[in-house]
């Protein structure tokens, strides 16, 4: 079958959140023609196969694409997120991206979208439905919006063996239960494991009926400190100031994490257990209190094998039974932790340029692509902030994060753009405070006073980590 030849300015591979945020800003800032290729049947990437009760872990007010609001603008009035900015459900997010494609991208006449297509590289892809083959020539750039390689429970293959008589399911299948199990074993200590435990508790499962296998405890972020509404200025920007002060005053790495916890920047499940993981999960104090009701937290390493009567872990075995549901939450949300320059010749590889903010990062990268000339300048403004995994990655992540913020603050055009980009969430908050508001100005002064000492201390700690590795 002969290939259909297509010519465009930008070929974007992936219509997940990153690809959509990048394309949206490119549409706003340029007159470019865009081709988007994705293997899913509609935009949204992993949201197409997310578990039914998933929600955002961050406020809806700064998720999605820059040109269209996702948030209702209201605070949640019930539930464990009560009093904070609403968290869009998975269904809402999926519908949002679909409407962005149908109501903004395609009507522009500058976007051609090829869903249900397998991309092979070098501009070649095939429709999984019709079998038609296509070859795309990108006049300007290829954009790999799949580089972060998001994985989800429904498509994840566990790294442990499972016996034939084991009642085992991904988190997606929990709402499909038709009979009451004797108990539940939740496998995985990350965001998905948290969601599974909270869902079970919300649906009336007694805490004693839940065992939570947690290979590593995690540091978590208080969601109250991530709100973009000016009413939360003292929490959000105050946490930034407290963070810089904790770094600057820390006498050791252990002391740093103690200070971060004491100041409310970081949270942990059990005060007696030192976390060894940091993935940037956000949580409310109410959610944390709910999770602490679960007393049977298994800290014996990763699961190696599940049989009908026992679970084998790295550190030993625990009993189980055929009437106990084993819920797989062991998939890592993002599996590619390696970094590379974002701008390389005719290839753009979106990665995070602000800690755990991939959609904001994609939007900023697109704006820099549209408004800057040289590759050197583009990469200088878009230093990669590595995705964290270990607890100490919080430290190594902070240096490029602070460097990027410094670079952006010195660029008047970029400062203006940031203050009007809904995905930023925070620049506008800072810019719009009253100069006569002494309380808020004092918080900003704390940040300014601590920034340089904090950067110096971070570099000291990074040197210690490098020597120890």
Predicted regions and their residues:
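Extreme N-terminal leader/targeting segments of oxidoreductases
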Residues: 1-10, 28-33, 146-175, 459-468
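N-terminal Rossmann-like FAD-binding beta1-loop-alpha1 element of flavoenzymes
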Residues: 7-36, 184-203
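Short hydrophobic core segments
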Residues: 11-13, 135-150, 184-187, 321-333
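Glycine-rich active-site loop/strand segments that organize a redox cofactor
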Residues: 39-96, 213-270
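Glycine-rich dinucleotide-binding loop and its adjacent helix/turn
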Residues: 83, 89, 96, 145-204, ...
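C-terminal catalytic lobe of FAD-dependent flavoproteins
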Residues: 263-264, 268-339, 430-469
């Amino acid at each position: 079958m002969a290939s259909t030849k297509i010519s465009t300015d930008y070929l974007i591979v992936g219509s997940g959140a990153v690809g959509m945020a990048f394309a949206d800003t490119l549409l706003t800032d340029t007159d470019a023609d865009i081709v988007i290729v994705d293997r899913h049947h509609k935009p949204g990437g992993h949201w197409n196969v997310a578990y039914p009760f998933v929600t955002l872990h961050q406020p809806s007010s700064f998720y999605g694409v820059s040109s269209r609001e996702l948030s209702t603008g209201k605070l949640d009035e019930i539930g464990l997120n009560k009093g904070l900015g609403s968290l869009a459900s998975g269904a809402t997010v999926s519908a949002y991206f679909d409407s962005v494609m149908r109501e903004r991208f395609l009507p522009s006449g500058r976007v051609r979208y090829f869903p249900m297509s397998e991309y092979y590289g070098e501009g070649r892809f095939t429709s999984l439905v019709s079998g038609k083959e296509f070859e795309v020539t990108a006049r300007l750039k290829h954009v790999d919006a799949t580089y972060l390689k998001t994985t989800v429970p429904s498509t994840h293959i566990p790294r442990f063996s499972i016996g034939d008589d084991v009642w085992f399911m991904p988190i997606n299948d929990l709402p499909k239960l038709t009979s009451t199990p004797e108990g539940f074993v939740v496998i995985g200590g990350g965001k998905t494991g948290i969601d599974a435990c909270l869902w079970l508790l919300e649906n009336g499962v007694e805490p004693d009926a839940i065992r939570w296998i947690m290979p590593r405890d995690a540091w978590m972020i208080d969601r109250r400190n991530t709100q973009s509404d000016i009413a939360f200025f003292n929490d959000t920007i105050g946490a930034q100031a407290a963070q810089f002060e904790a770094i600057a005053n820390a006498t050791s790495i252990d002391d740093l994490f103690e200070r971060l916890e004491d100041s409310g920047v970081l949270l942990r499940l059990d005060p007696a257990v030192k976390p060894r993981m940091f993935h940037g999960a956000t949580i409310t104090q109410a959610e944390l209190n709910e999770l602490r009701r679960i007393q049977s937290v298994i800290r014996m390493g990763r699961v190696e094998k599940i049989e009908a009567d026992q679970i084998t872990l790295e550190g030993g075995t625990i009993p189980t039974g055929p009437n106990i549901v084993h819920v797989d939450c062991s998939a890592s949300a993002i599996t590619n932790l390696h970094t590379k320059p974002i701008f390389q010749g005719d290839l753009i590889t979106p990665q995070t340029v602000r800690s755990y903010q991939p959609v904001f990062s994609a939007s900023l990268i697109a704006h820099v692509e549209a408004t800057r000339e040289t590759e050197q300048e583009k990469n200088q403004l878009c230093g990669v902030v590595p995705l964290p995994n270990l607890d100490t990655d919080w430290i190594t992540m902070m240096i490029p994060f602070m460097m990027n913020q410094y670079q952006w603050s010195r660029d008047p055009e970029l400062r203006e753009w940031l203050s009007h980009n809904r995905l930023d969430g925070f620049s506008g908050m800072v810019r719009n405070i009253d100069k006569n508001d002494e309380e808020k100005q004092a918080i900003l002064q704390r940040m300014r006073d601590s920034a340089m000492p904090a950067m110096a201390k971070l570099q000291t700690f990074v040197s210690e980590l490098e020597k120890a590795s």
